[in-house]
Amino acid sequence: MNYHKITYPDLENGLGVRITIWVSGCMHQCKGCHNPETWPIQSGKPFTSETIQELCNLLDKYDYLDGVTFSGGDPFHPLNVGTVTRLCKLLKSRYPHKNIWLYTGFTYEWLIRRPIYAQALEYIDVL
C-alpha cells in the first residue's frame, strides 16, 4: 500500500483529535473529489513497518488523540484492503480505547457481502 501523508493533529476528519492516513488508490474517482492526486494506486510513498512505528509512536506519545482515520484515495481499494485490515487489527489490539474511522466510496451493503471487506469492518468504528 502507498500513502500520501499522515496528518496530526487532525480535527476535520472525525470526532475529536485524530491521526489521518491518506492512502493512495481510488477506483471511484468521484466528481468533485477533494483529493484527486491520491487516485493513482502507485502515487505517494510505500507504507512500511517504519510508517507503522511512526503511527504507534504518535499514539503512545499523545494520549489526547481520540483515534485514527483512514482516507484517501480509498482505503478499501482492492490493493489496500489487506494492509488496512492488518493495521486496523493491530491498532484495535494495541489501543482499544481509540476509535477507527474509514472513508470509502463503497457502500456498507456492498462491503458486507464480500468476506475480505466484512473482516475489515470488524475493526472499524465509523464507516
Protein language model annotation of sequence segments:
Residues 125-126:
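Receiver (REC) domain switch/active-site residues of two-component response regulators
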Residues 2-29:
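N-terminal pre-triad scaffold of radical SAM enzymes
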Residues 1-3, 17, 35-102, 106-117:
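Conserved Radical SAM active-site core
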